[in-house]
Amino acid sequence: RKLYWPFIASPERPLTPLLFAYSPSVLPKPADWTAPNLHIPGYFFLDQPDYRPPQDLQDFLAEGQPPVCITFGSNIHQGAQQVTQAALAGLARTGNRGIFLTGWGGWRPESPPPGTLFLDSAPHDWLFPRCKTIVHHGGAGTTAAGLRSGLPNIVVPHATDQPFWARRVAAIAAGPQPIPIRQFSPERFVAALAEAEGENIQAGAAEIGRRIQAE
């Protein structure tokens, strides 16, 4: 049996399947991707069906309206405190509740304001559907989970591929135009929250959620 290593050019060598793990509903397959070994099967998820939420999270969700979830994943940003304070100000101005998943680079106040809850992390597949809007950095995995929830996504890209996915979210009407991390402010956050409540984005987010769930 031949291994054709390292990728020896041979007419006998079978084509290596190439899987692109994102949803074709988010980024359609390019017209020039005609090779039979190129596949876009949809997102891959690693759900946690056995997750049991801590009591403080259960209590917070039961106390009021679905919150805005704010998570920047494993990103470490020098302005984490300023960004968090801007998000808190935006929530206060709009009367929204909020859950902050602080991750590796998060900051939390010593005394969180009423209507907010700060956690290190929580499974996206469990938490996101219980929220109102998802605010995140645009990482591929968080974008996938946010879109699958069927809720509006407000993307605050930091670096690397995040601006690309942020633009795709807006292009499919699953969220407003992205807010680059260095431009994040209470005013821009308030405007994005208002836009996320509009009929167009609500419908777009729900539609992409249905498509991804069916893939």
Spans of model-derived segments:
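Short acidic active-site motifs
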Residues: 56-57, 122-123, 188
